[in-house]
Design a protein with these regions (language model features):
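Glycan-recognition patch characteristic of GH18 chitinases/ENGases
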Residues: 1
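Alpha/beta enzyme core
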Residues: 4-129, 149, 153-154
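General structural feature for long, well-ordered alpha-helical segments within catalytic domains
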Residues: 6, 39-43, 47, 61, ...
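Structural signal for hydrophobic packing residues in well-ordered secondary-structure cores
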Residues: 14, 18, 22, 26, ...
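Structured core elements
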Residues: 17-19, 59-61, 93-95, 134-136, ...
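Short, contiguous strand/loop micro-motifs
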Residues: 34-35, 134-135, 165, 255-256
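Catalytic alpha/beta core domains of metabolic enzymes, predominantly
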Residues: 100-244
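A mid-to-C-terminal "edge-of-domain" accessory segment
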Residues: 187-326
Length: 326
């Protein structure tokens, strides 16, 4: 919650735009700050005015907007900000913050929980330009990504993201998720190099020790790994059958199979061909003697009571032994 000294410090380091927290819900206005709505409104407008006087562009963070009185507080406040922007000639951004993740994307949902209603309302009842609107979501109810996409679709020009979705409580909107949402909506990547997503995930994991859950889309260890033999058989015939897209080209992550008791000869064959591809060797048919030797060894492990998956190191060793025996 900024004051004049904060703005002076921000300006001194060369920053031209800064965020100003302007909590909107009665939970914050009454219970946290102990103010009336009018007192809160006057206080916020004074802070934004100080920000503009300091030569900075304000970005107003409408905290807890999905629990706020939309027509009783949010719209009147946004109207005053747009008047201030017009009078000063300084653009004022509004960040709609779904602080507790209560927002929903469903058409016809009631305000203040309706994401589309919030974005539509700020544009049509307060005259906030699309380029001055952004969405800030949380994932408490697993709606982080879909709510952010809904905000885009209804006119917010930007959505706030974090790398790997790391953030308060259950996390924020993952940057990598919105990259692919953008591509699916626009039909192109607009020059983005999506392989960097894998590099970012590797960097964060190695440098911070953060363990990425293996099932995490796009960045988890197992996001494009299949364990079922019937799936592996499909992958042998055509990657598109069981791979979400060309993960090798877009993420530098070729599809993988995990060999276990249900992988079947197709799963073993797929693993061997991935190994051979890395070594610059030609692929082999799943009915080849090489695949049969390794498959028989795998089955022997489970016939003897093994319950864990076969590791890549074990499969590498058995594949090399089988190739030497040919």
């Amino acid at each position: 919650r900024a004051n004049k000294k904060d703005f002076e410090m921000v300006k001194s380091i060369g920053v031209k735009e800064t965020g100003v927290l302007v909590s909107c819900s009665d939970y914050h206005i009454f219970h946290k700050m102990g103010l009336t709505r009018k007192q809160a409104l006057d206080k916020y407008l004074g802070i934004v005015s100080d920000c503009i006087e300091a030569g900075l562009r304000p970005r107003c963070h409408f905290e807890d907007i999905t629990r706020a009185d939309f027509y009783g507080f949010v719209v009147p406040f946004a109207n005053r900000l747009m008047e201030m922007s017009e009078q000063s000639g300084v653009p004022i951004k509004i960040r709609a913050c779904d602080t507790m993740g209560f927002g929903v994307p469903y058409p016809g949902a009631s305000l203040p929980r309706s994401v589309s209603g919030i974005i539509y309302g700020l544009q049509h009842y307060s005259g906030v330009p699309s380029e001055m609107l952004e969405w800030h979501g949380h994932n408490d109810f697993y709606k982080g990504v879909v709510n952010a996409t809904t905000a885009w679709m209804y006119g917010a020009s930007a959505v706030n993201c974090s790398l790997l979705g790391i953030g308060e409580r259950t996390g924020n909107v993952p940057l990598e998720a919105m990259v692919f949402e953008y591509a699916s909506l626009r039909g192109h990547l607009n020059g983005m190099n999506t392989k960097v997503i894998t590099e970012i995930a590797d960097y964060i994991s190695k440098e911070t020790g953060y363990e990425i859950p293996p099932m995490t889309p796009f960045v988890g260890e197992n996001f494009n790994l299949t364990r079922a033999g019937i799936h592996a058989d499909g992958m042998l015939k055509n990657h598109e059958i069981y791979n979400i897209f060309d993960t090798d080209t877009l993420l530098d992550r070729p599809p993988k199979v995990s060999v276990n008791s249900t992988s079947g000869i197709a799963g073993v064959g797929y693993w061997i061909n991935q190994y051979r591809k890395k070594k610059g060797m030609s692929p082999v048919d799943k009915k080849s003697p090489l695949v049969r030797r390794v498959y028989d060894w795998v089955q022997e492990q489970y016939d003897e009571g093994r319950i864990t998956i076969i590791s890549d190191a074990e499969l590498t060793r058995q594949t090399e032994l089988a190739m030497e025996a040919e």
